[in-house]
Amino acid sequence: MVLDRIKKVNDIKQLNEEELEELQEEIRDFLVENIAKTGGHLASNLGVIELTMALHLSFDLTRDRIIWDVGHQSYTHKILTGRKLGFVTLRQYGGMSGFPKTQEDPADAFNTGHSSTSISAGLGMAQARELTGDNYYVVSVIGDGALTGGMAYEAMNNASRMKTNFIIVLNDNQMSISENVGGMNQYLNSFRTSDAYLDLKDGVTNSLNRIPVVGERMVKRIRNAKSGIKQLFVPGMFFENMGITYLGPVDGTNIKEIRKVLAEAKRVRGPVLVHVRTIKGEGYLPAERHPARFHGTGPFDIDTGVPLYHQEKAHYTDVFSTVMRKMGEREPKVVAITAAMADGTGLKRFKNLFPERFLSLIHISEPTRRTPIS
């Protein structure tokens, strides 16, 4: 097996294209087989196998830093850094963590948790790099769910203001920021990151700024005209308008295409966002059909995807669901609030019985809901 040759960071770079194709399928099979026994986050990890491989092929994790937002999608990253054997004890006491841990491996750049922290953490590392005069890449990988958290936007706002070289990878497995516009989009991506374009852009701006009185005004008008043209062709103008260069969207199942865009991102001066479209549960049909069920799962039957529950043990979520139902029936003033996770929190039954008393947040926006409650 090709997977058996991955013992440490950068071993993946010794593989040819055929072996890389074999490896991605072996990792997919490995994850399904092992998580079926131990439980864990399956759907999200199956969706980022190719993205993670592309990141490891594009960067040197003995030096460069990759921060995974939330971190539950870092299983392939753990495999590619030589921790395959640790999956026997995944998420068990004394075993391998289901999230990045700096104590576990030097390639885990940041102890992540829930949620929306990766861009801030990456920005801090990028600033530290500038202050110490070091030379390495910093990459923050954030999902579309975590991108709904206000902290992420605060960090992007600061990144654009500081003009620090910094790469953000948007792992988009749900929302549609934009549609791929084909050849024109690819052309614009490559053109805007070419050395000739970047040098010309800086040269023209500096020259115009030196013209007395009218120079700055001319630069502003050119920028406004350029922005208007880009609105017609370039997706992700939300990020562009924040001062963050946008590249993508790119097919998250195509390692070659992801590597190509990451190479372009390395050439950008200042913050850049790479938009990667992935599919939760990719390659395992039960997880593709029911990604929410396989977001965080216990042991399950591989052939059917059906959970292997131990009937003698009561699950906390089930007990909570029953208690909430009884409280809702007994007390009409009880209101249930969840962060867009009715299934995972055991509130789906309450939602169905008392829809008018069920409030769901818009993804990662707990502060916005908790403050009015107080």
Where are these regions (language model features)?
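N-terminal amphipathic, basic-rich helices that act as targeting or association modules
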Residues: 1-79, 240, 251-259, 275-276
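Cofactor-pocket helix-loop regions in the catalytic cores of large enzyme subunits
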Residues: 19, 24-31, 40-48, 233, ...
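Cofactor-binding active-site loop characterized by glycine-rich and histidine/acidic residues
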Residues: 41-162, 316, 327, 332-339, ...
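Acidic, glycine-rich active-site loops and adjacent beta-strand->loop/helix elements
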Residues: 70-75, 142-148, 170-176, 253, ...
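Short acidic, glycine/serine/threonine-rich loops at helix termini
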Residues: 76-82, 147-156, 178-183, 189, ...
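A glycine-rich helix N-cap at a beta->alpha junction
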Residues: 86-96, 161-173, 196-199, 359
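Long, well-ordered, tryptophan-enriched scaffold segments
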Residues: 174-320
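Single conserved hydrophobic/aromatic residue that forms the stacking wall/gate
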Residues: 362-374
